[in-house]
């Protein structure tokens, strides 16, 4: 088999700058003659604010909606719902990890959406990362925060880690 991907998590120092996760990948399986017998794409980006600023959330989601809509207007609602349902701490009374984003997996190329389509889609979503996230960082990076803000950030960051361990 063969796999490639890009994955990142940014855990900021400033309590008012959200954590962000981004992951895009492709997998291939081969038979004994080295022929591709299966291939699929997956990925997504999601935002986990410690303190919610609705304008930042709207901006983040709109940026990914715009990226998705260029390929298929059904992608954003579908992939947003998958993300919303995936990043949940079920052992904590269904606590959400953050405000969601998009997430997709097992997208196999076919006659209408081939390999190049899915590569271009993943690239467009990756390219949306900077315009979706950096404006929020720029707006929030100079905000002063208290020890109480930092304590809350550490609790929420612990829940983020918990999600990945459970």
Where are these regions (language model features)?
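A domain-level signal for the structural core that forms small-molecule/cofactor-binding pockets
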Residues: 1-166
């Amino acid at each position: 088999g063969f796999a490639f991907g890009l994955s990142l998590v940014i855990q900021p120092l400033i309590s008012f700058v959200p954590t962000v996760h981004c992951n895009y990948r492709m997998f291939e399986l081969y038979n004994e003659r080295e022929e591709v017998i299966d291939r699929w794409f997956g990925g997504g980006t999601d935002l986990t604010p410690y303190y919610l600023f609705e304008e930042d959330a709207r901006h983040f989601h709109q940026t990914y909606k715009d990226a998705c809509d260029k390929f298929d207007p059904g992608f954003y609602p579908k992939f947003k719902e998958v993300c919303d349902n995936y990043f949940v701490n079920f052992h904590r009374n269904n606590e959400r990890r953050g405000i969601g984003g998009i997430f997709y997996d097992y997208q196999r190329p076919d006659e209408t959406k081939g390999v190049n389509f899915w590569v271009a889609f993943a690239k467009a979503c990756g390219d949306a990362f900077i315009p979706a996230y950096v404006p929020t960082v720029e707006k929030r990076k100079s905000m002063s925060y208290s020890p109480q803000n930092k304590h809350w950030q550490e609790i929420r960051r612990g829940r983020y880690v918990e999600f990945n361990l459970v």
